[in-house]
């Protein structure tokens, strides 16, 4: 006897079961789920897979998203503890890791999260050998290096969310000070995603007007408007949010989704993401730091060669030294 489905639908051809824009998110904590909902609402994936060790929470998050399927255009949402669920992903986003505690620097997290990466990355690569990997877990620059080493993938296909969020915060705060929307305020933060990040005051502009031409002291101690406090706010903002609500989630979820769009749509937009900087600006070690990168379907296809002034270059090198002093002690 025919089923209702058989009476209703006649199959004509077998469809290709391999997704064209499959995304896997490893880690379904606050950051992972913020990434998930932003990606779904932007219609960036035709399949979304969630992976976590907390099986009950994982199933609950999957069901909660599936029940909202009417309101977005991703046809398949799956989850599992086993990495086979991530097979054939175009992009794997790693958010798993120990959460940063109130007052804890991102660098203090490092060895705990290195050990977590060792349990994740080989399985990811086994099931998706052609994927790009976007690392979000903190400290993101060092963990991007660790993932690159563990994965065996080309450095161009492993990149960290890096200073994309720092730069977004920077532009928001500049806009607040000027009364202008952040999309019209242009400025970059490079280096470490964290305490030693480097604001490029020399490039800050609105409508092509460099603020440094209006006040050469902009961003320095001699600046009467104290613009340097904006960078201080950028550095301290995550700590403040963690103190207030326990974690950060929404802004990083939006920032990651911004990067995902550039990769899956092959937009070739320029983002400050964490990439290999050995050989740049006098850096001799295998360090990952944020510099402006062209992001597309192959990952990081190009870097933009910024002309740093002497102060900016010194700060960038200091940022590299800060990370190297931690990174060289890692065991993995």
Swiss-Prot record:
HAMAP family: Lactate_dehydrog
UniProt subunit comment: Homotetramer. Interacts with RABL2/RABL2A; binds preferentially to GTP-bound RABL2.
Reactions accelerated catalytically: (S)-lactate + NAD(+) = pyruvate + NADH + H(+)
Post-translational modification Phosphoserine, affected residues: 301
Origin: domain of life: Eukaryota
Broadest EC class assigned to this enzyme: oxidoreductase
Entry's family note: Belongs to the LDH/MDH superfamily. LDH family.
Organism whose genome encodes this protein: Vulpes vulpes (Red fox)
A GO molecular-function annotation: L-lactate dehydrogenase activity
InterPro entries (alphabetical): L-lactate/malate_DH, L-lactate_DH, L-lactate_DH_AS, Lactate/malate_DH_C, Lactate/malate_DH_N, Lactate_DH/Glyco_Ohase_4_C, NAD(P)-bd_dom_sf
Keywords: Cytoplasm, NAD, Oxidoreductase, Phosphoprotein
Name by which UniProt lists this protein: L-lactate dehydrogenase C chain
Location of this chain's protein in the cell: Cytoplasm
Residue sites binding substrate per the record: 106, 138, 169, 248
Pathway the protein acts in: Fermentation; pyruvate fermentation to lactate; (S)-lactate from pyruvate: step 1/1
Binding site for NAD(+): 29-57, 99, 138
GO cellular component annotations of the record: cytosol; motile cilium
Catalytic residues in the record: 193 (proton acceptor)
Task performed by this protein: Possible role in sperm motility.
EC number, UniProt record: 1.1.1.27
Gene Ontology biological process terms, A to Z: ATP biosynthetic process; flagellated sperm motility; lactate biosynthetic process from pyruvate; pyruvate catabolic process
